[in-house]
Design a protein with these regions (language model features):
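Sec/Tat signal peptide C-region and signal peptidase I cleavage site
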Residues: 3-7
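Membrane-proximal, glycine/serine-rich, low-complexity loop/turn segments characteristic
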Residues: 8-258, 262-343, 347-348, 530-537, ...
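Exposed, low-structure sequence patches enriched in small/polar residues
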Residues: 207, 241-303, 312, 341-347, ...
Length: 780
């Protein structure tokens, strides 16, 4: 695909006022050319960009903050998260898992790609765009060289055909060669989106395709290469440290189609225009006048004919002179007879009989013009009929050309379905298709003063198809691809209040009636109250949830060459919890406290042995359930300080798990960011500082590369405790008009302290790396 980006044709004409709009530079020397179609560039370009997300079930629109904000831009490139809260396996764009349990999502039906969520854009997180002028964002960040470096480029484009219909695309490419052996990653994603926001009909459509390839190295063979390099006679660079696996890959391809549309029944009313809409109207009016002026000038100019000869324009140079009635002219019709009254005037025309009446008509017209100039007519929906189509297709291959001797504890077949990939080679395939239709009816909130809440009801049917290896009979040397299909029916509803400034709430539920999920229930409630306190607004929010869910299909059964389980008797996992969030904007304080109880906790586990020669042997992995109750307590404080140009941001999280053997958590997790923020020549905003991430020691989840999942360390004899080591970055983050850019040195403290630079057992993080990044916004 070819992407042509055209920036402003005369950049000196446009000046950023700093308030989100551009104005013309009066000192420009560009001459006016009436035949030049780009002359509208002399006028202010409207830059209003509105972004929002949509609910995956109902298609409800929620305004969103644009993802082009400059603060912490330098941290947005890491799969460890903006606040460093994720564990990863070293290289960027590799699988990850949050250390903050309450922020972990539910296990997805095709969990193999869930750890790559950093490189994906789910429909309910994707930002749709409505823009007054074509909008383009180009972002690029880079580090390292051709042997070990990283490259990331993202191109976003959005344009509106009119004020209702918007379209665009998002192209995203992540490529990391890896500082350690056999750990390269390559991810490409492309998304096409469209939205139509009409009065009665609304539509959101998103098509995405992803192609992911990741080399798996199984970790380094000996942690002492990192923690005690002096124990070796030779010094090893990062790319010389031996790894457990080589020539092993995971490939994940997926295609997604999301369509949500609705038909509204309601009435019209008038509301005031926003400032951006006023700017857009002024721009359109000025453009129309400009076109008219250019057309008039063109018609009045002398030009050359086809032979190059001068021709006279067609405009008359003198006014015509009246010469009286032509000879022989007649008056049409009969003259009125003597004594006959003239015909009555047209009674349908407005007759102005006095100056007072003329003034009144002018006042009415002026009032109408003022109303049209400052207000708009909007449609107020009363009832909506909603349909949502959600199609997801996944295909995964775990491939290996070689496996270490004794690395796997079990082998369930020798060859793939084509009779190849025998011996120590692997070719495991897994596929999943879901076609889900949801139909809903909504009674909208706020269509009159008595409609204090909105009410929705829905019906969903989800057709699912799974494919993976199976054996015709035990002892077969080759597998065949077996298919499983099921249909799931669920019903539910929502009661919500989102309008107003003081009190909001939302209650939604889903109940499964058929399929393997029959009997599953999901209930969620959240509310918030805003009230004044000491001259500031205080927000108090609360959340509660109850889930009784069946483990996913691949948690219940999974077949591959070396990992195999059939857990058809697994119980439903039951989770219940409450959370409170207390926020004071004036003091930059936010406190979150959450309590959750889990029964039949379902988790991944793995175990292996390491001999004296650092060989990994007897690898086993699977899905397990803890029948007892697990209690989880979480408290998180966000506190920011400011003293002149000095800013200090902090996030401190405390967690306690009643069963750390199956649900391990760090007791304390800290993110801190200290920086100076100042202006250079009144245009360039600079953030100059350092941030750090730290967590206390705990038995962090290991990584099972055969299924791309983090798993509990079940081998008590060889499990590894991680933590107690800070990761420190220093950076200069800058913002100039519509451009963001940064220079960063990540992990500047490499080799200091206990040198435990691991976020997963045997997977060291990258060392000290110089990184740069830039992001441009174009409005033209």
């Amino acid at each position: 695909m070819t992407l042509n980006i055209v920036a402003q044709s005369n950049p000196t004409r446009i000046t950023d006022t700093g308030d989100g709009f551009n104005v013309t530079d009066d000192n420009s020397t560009r001459s006016f050319n009436p035949n030049h179609r780009d002359s509208v560039a002399d006028k202010e370009i409207p830059m209003g960009v509105h972004t929002w997300t949509v609910d995956r079930r109902y298609g409800d629109v929620t305004p969103a903050v644009t993802d082009t904000l400059p603060h912490l831009y330098q941290n947005s490139i890491f799969n460890t998260g903006v606040f460093g809260e994720y564990n990863t396996i070293g290289n960027n764009y590799t699988p990850r898992i949050s250390r903050i349990i309450m922020d972990r999502p539910k296990t997805s039906e095709f969990f193999f790609t869930q750890p790559y969520d950093f490189t994906m854009k789910e429909p309910d997180a994707f930002q749709f765009v409505n823009t007054l002028s074509p909008f383009t964002n180009l972002s690029y960040d880079n580090c390292g060289d051709k042997q070990n470096g990283e490259d990331h480029i993202d191109a976003k484009f959005a344009v509106n055909a009119n004020k209702r219909l918007g379209i665009g695309f998002d192209l995203d490419y992540h490529y990391a060669r890896g500082y350690y052996q056999n750990q390269s990653t390559s991810h490409f994603g492309a998304s096409l989106f469209a939205s139509y926001i009409g009065d009665k009909y609304q539509m959101h459509a998103l098509f995405s395709t992803y192609h992911r390839k990741a080399a798996e190295n199984g970790g380094i063979t000996d942690d002492n290469y990192i923690t005690h390099p002096e124990s070796y006679d030779d010094q090893f660079s990062e790319n010389e440290i031996p790894t457990v696996l080589s020539k092993n890959w995971n490939r994940n391809n997926s295609n997604h189609l999301f369509l949500s549309h609705r038909y509204n029944i309601g009435f019209y009313k008038r509301v005031a225009l926003t400032e951006a809409e006023k700017k857009a109207r002024a721009f359109a009016k000025a453009s129309a006048q400009d076109r008219k002026q250019r057309d008039n000038l063109r018609n009045n100019q002398d030009g050359d004919d086809a032979n190059g000869n001068k021709r006279r324009n067609n405009r008359r140079t003198t006014d015509p002179v009246a010469t009286g009635r032509p000879d022989g002219a007649r008056i049409a019709g009969d003259l009125p007879k003597t004594g006959e009254k003239p015909a009555d005037p047209d009674s349908t025309r407005i007759q102005v009989t006095s100056q007072q009446m003329a003034d009144s008509l002018l006042a009415v017209q002026h009032q109408k013009d003022s109303l049209d100039a400052n207000t708009k007519r909007i449609y107020v929906p009363v009832t909506s009929f909603i349909h949502t189509l959600d199609i997801n297709s996944f295909s995964r291959i775990n491939q290996a050309y070689a496996s270490p001797a004794g690395y796997y504890a079990n082998t369930y077949y020798k060859y793939d379905d084509r009779g190849i990939y025998g011996n120590d080679s692997i070719y495991d395939q897994t596929k999943y298709l879901s076609v889900k239709n949801t139909f809903a009816v909504a009674l909208m909130e706020g269509f009159n003063k008595y409609a204090k809440a909105g009410l929705k009801a829905f019906f969903s049917y989800d057709h699912r198809k799974y494919q993976m290896p199976d054996l015709l009979q035990e002892g077969d040397e080759g597998y065949y691809m077996r298919s499983w299909s099921e249909g799931l029916v669920s019903v539910g509803g929502q009661l919500s209040k989102t309008q107003g400034r003081t009190f909001h709430y939302n209650l939604d539920g889903e109940f499964f009636l058929t399929g393997s999920n029959a009997g599953s229930v999901s209930l969620n409630f959240n509310t918030d109250v805003n009230f004044p306190l000491f001259g500031d607004t205080v927000r108090l929010a609360a959340k509660a949830h109850f889930d009784r869910i069946t483990p996913t299909f691949f948690q219940r059964q999974y077949h591959s060459k070396h990992l195999w389980w059939d857990n058809g008797d697994m119980s439903k996992e039951i989770r219940s919890g409450i959370e409170g969030i207390f926020t004071i904007d004036k003091t930059h304080t936010q406190l979150r406290v959450a309590v959750e109880e889990i029964k039949n906790y379902t988790y991944f586990g793995m175990e292996y042995a390491i001999d004296e020669k650092h060989n990994f042997t007897g690898l086993q992995g699977g899905v397990y359930q803890e029948g007892g109750n697990i209690n989880l307590l979480t408290a998180q404080l966000r506190q920011n300080f400011k003293l002149g140009p000095l800013h200090w941001e902090n996030i401190v999280t405390y967690q306690h798990s009643s069963n750390k053997d199956v649900l391990p958590v760090p007791t304390v997790n800290i993110f801190t960011n200290l920086f100076f923020k100042f202006l250079v020549v009144k245009q360039l905003t600079v953030e100059l500082g350092a941030d750090a991430t730290f967590f206390t020691k705990y038995y962090a989840p290991d990584y099972l590369p055969q299924i791309s999942q983090f798993a509990v360390q079940k081998n008590v004899e060889s499990r590894v405790e991680l933590g107690g080591y800070p990761f420190v970055d220093v950076y200069a983050n800058m913002h100039l008009k519509r451009t963001r850019f940064f220079v960063m040195m990540s992990h500047v403290n490499k080799g200091m302290g206990n040198k435990m630079m691991f976020l997963a057992p045997h997977y060291p993080q990258n060392g000290k790396v110089l990184r740069i990044g830039v992001s441009w916004n174009f409005y033209n």
